[in-house]
From Swiss-Prot:
<protein>
    <recommendedName>
        <fullName>Tetracycline repressor protein class E</fullName>
    </recommendedName>
</protein>
<dbReference type="InterPro" id="IPR001647">
    <property type="entry name" value="HTH_TetR"/>
</dbReference>
<keyword id="KW-0804">Transcription</keyword>
<dbReference type="GO" id="GO:0046677">
    <property type="term" value="P:response to antibiotic"/>
</dbReference>
<dbReference type="GO" id="GO:0003677">
    <property type="term" value="F:DNA binding"/>
</dbReference>
<dbReference type="InterPro" id="IPR036271">
    <property type="entry name" value="Tet_transcr_reg_TetR-rel_C_sf"/>
</dbReference>
<keyword id="KW-0805">Transcription regulation</keyword>
<keyword id="KW-0046">Antibiotic resistance</keyword>
<keyword id="KW-0460">Magnesium</keyword>
<dbReference type="InterPro" id="IPR004111">
    <property type="entry name" value="Repressor_TetR_C"/>
</dbReference>
<keyword id="KW-0238">DNA-binding</keyword>
<dbReference type="InterPro" id="IPR003012">
    <property type="entry name" value="Tet_transcr_reg_TetR"/>
</dbReference>
<dbReference type="GO" id="GO:0046872">
    <property type="term" value="F:metal ion binding"/>
</dbReference>
<dbReference type="InterPro" id="IPR009057">
    <property type="entry name" value="Homeodomain-like_sf"/>
</dbReference>
<keyword id="KW-0614">Plasmid</keyword>
<feature type="binding site">
    <location>
        <position position="82"/>
    </location>
    <ligand>
        <name>tetracycline</name>
    </ligand>
</feature>
<keyword id="KW-0678">Repressor</keyword>
Amino acid sequence: MARLSLDDVISMALTLLDSEGLEGLTTRKLAQSLKIEQPTLYWHVRNKQTLMNMLSEAILAKHHTRSAPLPTESWQQFLQENALSFRKALLVHRDGARLHIGTSPTPPQFEQAEAQLRCLCDAGFSVEEALFILQSISHFTLGAVLEEQATNQIENNHVIDAAPPLLQEAFNIQARTSAEMAFHFGLKSLIFGFSAQLDEKKHTPIEDGNK
């Protein structure tokens, strides 16, 4: 029998994730699918949280193609492309957003995280502001994908018909608007807000503490 590799474990775990969802993805089921005993699996995966971290890292490494800024793009362009790429990666597999929540950058991702911070700091943001901007983009993207991947969509026409006029119109707009379109609107608004804050910061006179 060929020796089990980490790639084999990750590949089978992603298959289980797509078929069973995050709740159904357990180390017991994974071991059964790999036709091995659980103690053998522990050589690669100690527990479910470790497995989730591994899967999240593997998904981003393969599908999140714009995690680092390009030398020729503005910080605004980077934030937009980064968020769109992140969203696309989260949507590749079932429960992708839930899988990613609670994870932190790992050593292989440190260089990219540093480049992201540097891109914003070079534009005039402080390290604290750069961190909050990246967190805001990440949280917005995760929340949007969580909503998109959820199954509790409003499908009851009786509920919609009973709504007051503005809410009814909003429901109708939501029904004919793609999640991607709504995401673009929110992302554009966030970046516009960051730009306004930076402009205000650059044009605010520095008070002389000696006066």
